[in-house]
């Protein structure tokens, strides 16, 4: 077997292992055990090539080391019943970073990202079916649970295989980015998959994802817009095709797609003003956090250890309706949670990682699609986890770690290329 084909085949297998991890996580029957399926990559790549961490990998590693130390020092302040979960998550952080390093050091990055985009498009097709039926088909088949809100109603939000709607939204953003930068050769299928991802994002109804798209679009325009009159033929053809489809839907089925989309977006954002809606809860938990930190400077600076946010929420729950609604389950903001757990010191490590992604996106060569793609994907995740605790889900931390590792490998390849030249 030619060496190049062998690398490509192994890359497909490596992505299949990652996909299996995502699928098994949604079963919700094995706790966090699905992460162990990632060790299958050692069957694909039995020879481990050790090397130095890149900047983003090092940032994640130092964050994991620091929060582990803080957790050990504050073990007595842990909320009863969360001790085991805290240490399990910390162990999984290190496993994710190690596995991401091994995977990124062996796969063909371009093929791996193309696999993400293609499979993401196929999953989005499944998501559209789910959205039409307003029933979590795949989630129910995998987990046997019907714990998704608003089943059978107009407010239903698709989850596909990702456990919760807001988590699904983050993955859909990553799929969209990979699909845009790494299309398949079949143009018609490529357009259908791209449209499917966009429709799935709309059916997912996650405001965090929509905001992430807006932010990424601004960054993209800053990097790529030259403000000239050069016309790209493909863009013109795709634009005409989209307008034709919209016109056809309006005339034949009397479906005004643009108006429907605008109405859906307005409804989702206006709904956040209702008491008890996620955004109102987030605002109050943030306000309460600042009140708490004023009297607890040590926690603000250094944190109280993994899951310390649960301790805080027991003291400062969000109460609505004179006590009829009490929320103390989660802060629903990863950055505020990081401060509670590891202080401004821990937050500095994570911000270093995400700002490195932004810097690389802005400074990398426009023709280096792999680097642009992975850094955009990291920025997308950095945006959506502002609205929930993504680091409490090992398969999300793993996915972010893989993207960070791929970004580091892209930098290394560029440096090697420059040394040769």
Residue spans for each PLM region:
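A membrane-periplasm/extracellular boundary helix in multi-pass inner-membrane enzymes
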Residues: 134, 224-273, 294-296
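Helix-loop-helix junctions and helix-breaking kinks within/between transmembrane helices
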Residues: 22-35, 83-85, 163-169, 191-226, ...
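Transmembrane signal-anchor hairpin modules in multi-pass inner-membrane enzymes, especially those
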Residues: 1-80, 110, 114, 182-188, ...
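Hydrophobic transmembrane alpha-helices and their immediate junctions
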Residues: 54, 58, 184, 189, ...
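Aromatic-anchored transmembrane helix interface
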Residues: 59-68, 79-104, 114-115, 120
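Long extracytoplasmic/lumenal interhelical loops at the membrane interface
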Residues: 141-143, 273-342
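Alpha-helical transmembrane segments of multi-pass inner-membrane proteins
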Residues: 113-141, 160-223
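Transmembrane alpha-helices of multi-pass inner-membrane enzymes
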Residues: 38-42, 217-218, 353, 372-421
